[in-house]
Amino acid sequence: IYMEVIIIKIPIQSTKKDVKNFLNELMTILNSQNFNEDNDLIIIRSTKDDIQFSTRYLMLDLDYDTSDIVERLKELTLAEYSETLIDKDDSNPPLLFVFGKSIDNKLVYIKLKIKGNTSKKILCLSFHYARHNMNFPYK
């Protein structure tokens, strides 16, 4: 018997307040004097699908390094929020915040979470050209 497993991502819409709280926490970490982009920002660069929708491809295409990604993350706004996903692989914390940002007239899909209680780290699971249209509930 052949069975196909389909992984269903269930997006939820966080409240404006929750998105603002996430962005405030993100900015606090990024703008902290103690922030070290090599230790406090984890960028997942693995390529699962098409190479042109990978973080590595975008970084090469735009000649970006980690500090460029940090600068773009510092610019994120409520209007760029798209959705919230549940992280099936890591439930600590379970929420992944998804943003869409226009960079060089291309839409970039950004998926983030903040980990840790005392020493917080930013986990950037996606920073690549958007594969699909994105919705922006607070635009």
Label each PLM-derived region with a short phrase.
Residues 5-17, 21-93:
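Compact soluble domain cores
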Residues 114-139:
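Enriched for short, Lys/Arg-rich terminal
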Residues 74-121:
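Functional cores of ribonucleases/endoribonucleases
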